[in-house]
Amino acid sequence: MAQTLNRSLTDLGALLHLVDPTLPIGGFNHSNGLETFVQQRVVESKATLEEYVQTQLLQNWIYNDGAYLSLAFDAMNEGNFDRLCELDWQLSATKVARESREGSFKLGVRLLKIFIRYETHALLTAYQKAIAEKRVQGYFPIVFAMVAQAMGLTKADTLYAFYYNAAVGVITNGVKLIPLSQMDGQDILFDLRGSLVQAVELSFDPDEEWLGAATLANDIRAMQHEVLYTRLYMS
């Protein structure tokens, strides 16, 4: 019993560390198009911010970052390094907005730099070498999956943590940009509990025919963000 409990708590600690908002990777610098939506008054209230997060979660992330994370986790389980590289290349092709694309691999490289110091795994070492040699970019969802699997976390927990972390980031940025009260942000996060579980279920075994399915409005706003006159975020 004690051994099982200790393992469970160790896994929980690893998961909490992986989604710690204070990790020095720069995630708070990126809105991925949300800032444009706010400036255009498309997202301007608690209701519209919640609708935006729900749309991102169930119409964007499950076919893009979440799906690639799911497939990368499987590739780690199989020890398939070539597959991990292939997923990195594919994800690069689907990220059409330059700022979002660059932001993702910058976050991934920084995340790997932190956790490779704690997790000994041949594929993490090989992937870091491939990044240094410019053979892969090191996108955040791929690295997140690799680190989580190396920690011994389950795929379901990893997906939930990834979506939760992404949702919290959007809500935090939205509360700041619109602006809204902190309690409004907490209400939105509470309302997302069921949707987060649904997202995990929908992307646990992703249909590769749907990889890269786009929310065009978000991609356009992410590209428009590059030329905003004033902005708080890098993407």
UniProtKB/Swiss-Prot annotation:
InterPro entries: UreF (IPR002639), UreF_sf (IPR038277)
Protein origin, superkingdom: Bacteria
HAMAP family membership: UreF
Main location class: cytoplasm
Entry-linked Pfam families: UreF
Residues forming coiled coils: none
Disulfide bonds: none
UniProt keywords, alphabetically: Chaperone, Cytoplasm, Nickel insertion
Record-linked Gene3D superfamilies: Urease accessory protein UreF
Transmembrane feature ranges: none
Localisation per UniProt entry: Cytoplasm
UniProt similarity note: Belongs to the UreF family.
A single Gene Ontology CC term: cytoplasm
Keyword ATP-binding included in the entry's annotation: no
Known role: Required for maturation of urease via the functional incorporation of the urease nickel metallocenter.
Protein name: Urease accessory protein UreF
Quaternary organization: UreD, UreF and UreG form a complex that acts as a GTP-hydrolysis-dependent molecular chaperone, activating the urease apoprotein by helping to assemble the nickel containing metallocenter of UreC. The UreE protein probably delivers the nickel.
Keyword Chaperone attributed: yes
Signal peptide range in chain numbering: none
GO molecular function, one term: nickel cation binding
